[in-house]
From Swiss-Prot:
The gene is Znf827. As part of a ribonucleoprotein complex composed at least of HNRNPK, HNRNPL and the circular RNA circZNF827 that nucleates the complex on chromatin, may negatively regulate the transcription of genes involved in neuronal differentiation. Could also recruit the nucleosome remodeling and histone deacetylase/NuRD complex to telomeric regions of chromosomes to regulate chromatin remodeling as part of telomere maintenance. This is Zinc finger protein 827. It comes from Mus musculus (Mouse). One of its GO terms (biological process) is establishment of protein localization to telomere. The lineage of its organism: Eukaryota, Metazoa, Chordata, Craniata, Vertebrata. Keywords: Chromosome, DNA-binding, Isopeptide bond, Metal-binding, Nucleus, Repeat, Telomere, Transcription, Transcription regulation, Ubl conjugation, Zinc, Zinc-finger. There is a cross-link at residues 175, 215, 225, 357, 369, 463, 472, 520, 546, 577, 584, 594, 636, 655, 670, 701, 707, 739, 775, 795, 867, 888, 955, 1011 (Glycyl lysine isopeptide (Lys-Gly) (interchain with G-Cter in SUMO2)). A motif (RRK motif) lies at residues 3-5. There is a cross-link at residue 670 (Glycyl lysine isopeptide (Lys-Gly) (interchain with G-Cter in SUMO1)). Coiled coil: none annotated. Belongs to the krueppel C2H2-type zinc-finger protein family. Residues 613-627, 958-974 have a biased composition (Low complexity). Part of a transcription inhibitory ribonucleoprotein complex composed at least of the circular RNA circZNF827, HNRNPK and HNRNPL. Interacts with the nucleosome remodeling and histone deacetylase/NuRD complex. Interacts with RBBP4; the interaction is direct and recruits RBBP4, a component of the NuRD complex, to telomeres.
Length: 1078
């Protein structure tokens, strides 16, 4: 094959000193070693696999070149080419080694003259394929060769890594053949027939120094932020490199790239493709040297990974574990004094990979690591809690009850369980009479009874828990059941029952016998009715025998104690007893149970009279009626007595009496009697009988009661039998205290007879369960209806002579069929039923809003910035719903384009448009009622009506006797102009301040002709009322917050400043109302 023509290199100038060349080359070496490249080369090591295999023809062509030019180094003259062939090869290899491994020697590529690179490439390929380099320094007598690599090189056999290096070298050599253009430089000097470098630095190559250079090159590659790898698929196959997950060949390729980029002079502006690219073969003596360097580096790092030996040439610093932190390198120091710490921060990631955990890690509890349950995944912070939680899954129950087989895992659950046995020791069991629920704990039954509170019932049974000396309210209603017994140290046993019957007449008008205790539901609306105690006796004896002493009144129910009909003297005696108890005086309240007939015998025999007596002499023996054991027939209707602590009752009386006194001063409440039927007892009962009252249900009594020791205060019980509300308790006790204080009675009577305001009717407020509306009834009729006022009650007390009038049972429960709420008045139920219908009779007079109840309408009116008086709402509703005769007199009406609202009243329409935003307030029109004429100017519609519809009977607002409804200013003139000399209208600055004060002389001027017939008619809306005071309050709706009117658009402002700002918008055309005066 013909030889390729070789170009002779230009001869370098001989006058340039070697020292200058060395200094320039030294400075370039500093720049290469320390700084990162800002002009990345286009050639990348990622393109190696593109030309992995060279074509056979190219390789044969390259191998067939002449040996004269096989070195790839042209000589200045042709006759010296053969003489320096071998020396040039050795010298070039040494220089290339210096350019790669020594910071003081730069690249060789820029120094070669532009010549053909084919012989050099073929020679390098042959060297790499051979896998070894034979250096024969004595062949040409050149013993002074600067290459001194013999002692430090130990060649390893070819490996997979060496093959990759060979492929990389071939790839880079081919790149050099295609795009490498050499430029003349002063890096080599021709001296004595051969090329000599301008630097005398020798290359002392060792594996340790090679490792340093490799790390420095990797550091430079990592610093190059502009380097972007476009093809991830062109990587080499995985190789376990000690540097990182990348292979060592990738590191070496990056090294060659950085060397080629640093070899450019600062003044050279060639693009990266035109710059010289140094092949791997020119950096080292052979591929074997590269292979050995990689092997030594891997061995060094692997040895360091296992253990840090002190004799390691370059131990990896701790900063290598954080390869992500990339900092710019410091300014480059001289290459001879380059410190190793500059390489520490920017080395490639070590193949150690995973950072080892610190050896001094704290225990789990000390470090705060949470504990997680492996079964349910619950995360717990403390180990003790975690162990306790694991008991749930393991099933270990270490706590066992000593009295039963009950076991639990937690101690607090065992303590709660032991309370069951405490009640069982006393023989107590609590059972619900409305369902099969049974509990040994009273509190559980009390909670259970809440599920029955929304259903009407005439009887319910709750076993009473004998509490500690605390007053607790709990429901106690029963037919038959277990009896609570409390065994005290003295052997005292308290036993009692209450008599009830299961007749179906208890929910109606009553039946024979003593009725059960009825529980009235408390509605959630309008101060609902509290619980009431109702007892019925249809067969009560007609005659009422007066007892000898007021202290002889005995009762079997706690309800009669707080009823409204006890006498003043009896209440006084009771309060005196309570006062004595508060003074630490011993008072024995021994309660005995009186006889009650059977339910079957109630129709044939008279029922005993209910009364109660406080017995200060407990030693006095009582008749045999209560002390004898009860017969089986009498046992079924026996009454369970319960004692009441005098101290607890007194404290509750004083507290609730004070609260009721405050309530009396705040608002007047009418009285209404309680639904309590009092049974009369024969006069044969001893006056010294001890009191016995209770509402507890229990079993039959089988033995007489024993008296408490003298001076011993019985344990405190619940004051009330049912779980009544605080309001009812306060009202009950207030009635008792009211009987004692006659001043309170007179104050209440006077307050009930008079009402100060004509606008507040009796039905406006929710009445108390003790109030009465039957003022006009006779005393007998009042008794039949179960409602008696306070004065009539006193009359009945005086007539009966005993303060215990007879009450007829009256069922006042009115349940709602829709939601189940129960009310005590039919009027309240009727008002409540309106919520379940679709009727909305409460309509807003300013907009189409309608509400079901009055409160919602009042709430809605706040949108219009109107402070409405509650009494005006009904009149407004009646005026809006009624069709006024003035509706046909308006010749035009206003229409809102936003929501379609239409009205004939200007003020009403302005109030409506104020609900919209500013942009929407101009979207309206004024329409003629007689034709289809539409305009936005009120002056135009008036002109239209005056010319087109003059013969119509309808009158315009300006022609009517009443003031114009289109302007508030005309209203102020008519309202304050005639006979009113005290009130005046103040107009300052054209702000039209409306101050309307209707006085007796001014009102006839509004509607002189129609006042006797229609009353007071509002000129702003269809409101009509009959009283002047109500009309005055209604005018405040329109005038209290809108006092300043715009004479252009009739919009109202609250302050003069706002009106001035608003008028400015009429001076500029806005597309809405024009600024016309009319």
């Amino acid at each position: 094959m013909p030889r390729r023509k070789q170009e002779q290199p230009k001869r370098l100038p001989s006058h340039v000193s070697r020292q200058d060349e060395a200094e320039g080359d030294f400075s370039e070496g500093e720049q290469w070693y320390g700084n990162s490249s800002e002009t990345p080369s286009e050639a990348s090591y990622g393109e190696v696999q593109e030309n992995y295999k060279l074509s056979l023809e190219d390789r044969i062509q390259e191998q067939s070149t002449s040996p004269d030019t096989s070195l790839g180094s042209a000589t200045p003259s042709s006759h010296t080419l053969e003489l320096v062939a071998l020396d040039g090869e050795v010298l070039r290899d040494s220089l290339q080694c210096q350019g790669h491994l020594s910071p003081g020697v730069s690249s060789v590529c820029d120094d070669d003259p532009p010549s053909s690179n084919k012989p050099l490439s073929s020679n390098l390929r042959r060297l790499l394929e051979a896998g070894s380099l034979k250096l024969d320094g004595t062949a040409n007598g050149r013993v002074e060769s600067p290459v001194n690599v013999g002692p430090s090189l130990s060649f390893s056999p070819p490996s997979h890594h060496a093959q990759q290096l060979s492929v990389l070298a071939r790839k880079l050599a081919e790149k050099q053949d295609q795009s490498d253009q050499f430029t003349p430089s002063n890096r080599f000097i021709w001296n004595q027939g051969k090329w000599l470098p301008n630097s005398t630095t020798t290359c002392g190559l060792s594996p340790d120094s090679a490792i340093l250079k490799l790390k420095a090159a990797a550091n430079a590659v990592l610093q190059d932020k502009s380097l972007s790898r476009t093809e991830e698929s062109l990587r080499f196959e995985s190789f376990s490199s000690p540097f990182s997950s990348q292979s060592a060949s990738s590191t070496l390729a990056a090294l060659s790239k950085k060397v080629s980029e640093r070899s450019l002079t600062p003044g050279q502006e060639h693009p990266p493709p035109a710059s010289s690219f140094l092949s791997l073969a020119s950096m080292t003596s052979s591929a074997a040297l590269l292979k050995e360097v990689a092997a030594r580096a891997a061995g060094s790092l692997l040895a360091e990974k296992s253990s840090l030996l002190p004799d390691d040439p370059l131990p990896l610093p701790s900063s290598e574990k954080k390869p992500e932190k990339v900092t710019p390198p410091p300014p480059p120091p001289p290459p001879t004094a380059q410190p190793p710490q500059s390489l520490e921060l920017l080395l490639l990631p070590v193949s150690k990979g995973r950072a080892s955990k610190p050896s001094n890690s704290a225990p789990e509890e000390e470090s705060g690591k949470p504990f997680q349950c492996p079964i349910c995944g619950l995360v717990i912070k403390r180990k003790s809690y975690w162990k306790r939680h694991m008991v749930i899954h393991t099933g270990l129950k270490s706590h066992q009850c000593p009295l039963c087989p009950f076991r639990c895992a937690r101690k607090d659950n065992l303590k709660s369980h032991m309370k069951v046995h405490q009640h069982q020791d006393r023989g107590e069991t609590f059972q619900c009479q409305l369902c099969p629920f049974t509990s040994s704990r009273h509190f559980s039954l009390k909670l259970h009874m809440r599920c029955h509170q929304h259903f009407l019932r005439t009887e319910a049974k709750v076993k009473e828990e004998i509490p500690d000396p605390d007053v607790k309210g709990s429901p106690h209603l029963s037919d038959s059941g277990c009896l609570g017994q409390q065994r005290e140290g003295g052997g005292t046993e308290l036993v009692g029952t209450v008599m009830t019957s299961n007749t179906p007449e208890r929910t109606g008008q009553g039946g024979a016998g003593v009725a059960p205790l009825l529980v009235k539901e408390e509605p959630k609306e309008d101060n609902g009715l509290p619980t009431s105690f109702t007892l019925n006796a249809a067969d009560r004896p007609a005659n009422h025998t007066k007892l000898k002493d007021p202290s002889e009144y005995v009762s079997n129910s706690a309800a009669v104690l707080f009823s409204q009909d006890i006498s003043v003297k009896m209440a006084s005696d009771f309060l005196m007893k309570l006062s004595a108890a508060n003074q630490k005086e011993p008072m024995n309240l021994n309660f005995k149970v009186k006889e009650e007939p059977k339910e079957e015998e109630s129709l044939s025999m008279p029922l005993p009279r209910s009364s109660y007596v406080f017995s200060p002499e407990p030693e006095v023996s009582t008749p045999s009626v209560s002390e004898d054991p009860l017969t089986p027939q009498e046992g079924k209707g026996s009454v369970l007595r319960r004692d009441m602590s005098a101290k607890a009752a007194s404290e509750l009386l004083m507290k609730l009496s004070a609260e009721s006194y405050k309530e009396t001063q705040a608002v007047t409440v009418k009285e209404e009697p309680m639904e309590v039927d009092i049974q009369d007892s024969p006069a044969s009962i001893s006056p010294s009988r001890n009191i016995g009252y209770s509402t507890l249900m229990g079993r039959e009594k089988t033995e007489p009661l024993q008296k408490l020791p003298e001076g011993r205060v019985p344990p405190e019980r619940n004051l009330f039998s049912q779980d009544i509300s605080v309001k009812m308790a306060s009202e009950l006790l207030f009635q008792l205290s009211e009987k004692v204080s006659k001043e309170h009675n007179h104050t209440k009577e006077n307050a009930m007879r008079t009402t100060t305001s004509p606008f507040f009717s009796e039905d406006t407020f929710r009445q108390s369960p003790f109030t009465s509306n039957s003022k006009d009834l006779l005393p007998g009729e009042s008794v039949l209806h179960g409602r008696v006022s306070a004065p009539e009650t006193e009359k009945i007390v005086l007539e009966a002579g005993n303060g215990l009038p007879s009450w007829k049972f009256n069922d006042q429960l009115f349940p709602c069929d829709v939601c189940g709420k129960v009310f005590g008045r039919q009027q309240t139920l009727s008002r409540h039923l309106s919520l379940h219908t679709e009727e909305r009779k409460y309509k807003c007079h300013l907009c189409p809003y309608a509400a079901k109840c009055r409160a919602n309408l009042n709430q809605h009116l706040t949108v219009h910035s109107v402070k409405l008086v509650s009494t005006d709402t009904e009149d407004i509703v009646s005026a809006v719903t009624s069709e006024g005769s003035d509706g046909k007199k308006h010749p035009y009406y206003y229409s809102c384009h936003v929501c379609g609202f239409e009205t004939e009243l200007n003020v009403q329409f302005v109030s409506h448009m104020s609900l919209h935003v500013d942009k929407e307030q101009w979207m309206f029109s004024i329409c003629c009622t007689a034709c289809d004429f539409v305009t936005m100017e009120e002056a135009e519609i008036k002109t239209h009506i005056g010319t087109k519809h003059t013969g119509d009977d309808r009158k315009t607002p300006s022609e009517s006797n009443s003031p114009s409804s289109s302007s508030l200013s005309t209203l102020s003139d008519s309202a304050n102009g005639k006979d009113d000399s005290d009130s005046s209208q103040k107009n300052k600055g054209g702000n039209n301040l409306l101050v309307i004060s209707v006085v007796p002389g001014s009102q006839p001027s509004l509607n002189n002709e129609e006042k006797p017939e229609k009353g007071f008619e509002c000129v702003f809306c269809n409101f009509v009322c009959k009283t002047k005071n109500m009309f005055e309050r209604h005018l405040q709706i329109h005038l209290i917050t809108r006092m300043f009117e715009c004479d252009v658009c009739h919009k109202f402002m609250k302050t003069p400043e706002q009106l001035l700002e608003h008028k400015k918008c009429h001076t500029v055309p806005t597309g809405g109302l024009n600024s016309g005066q009319w």
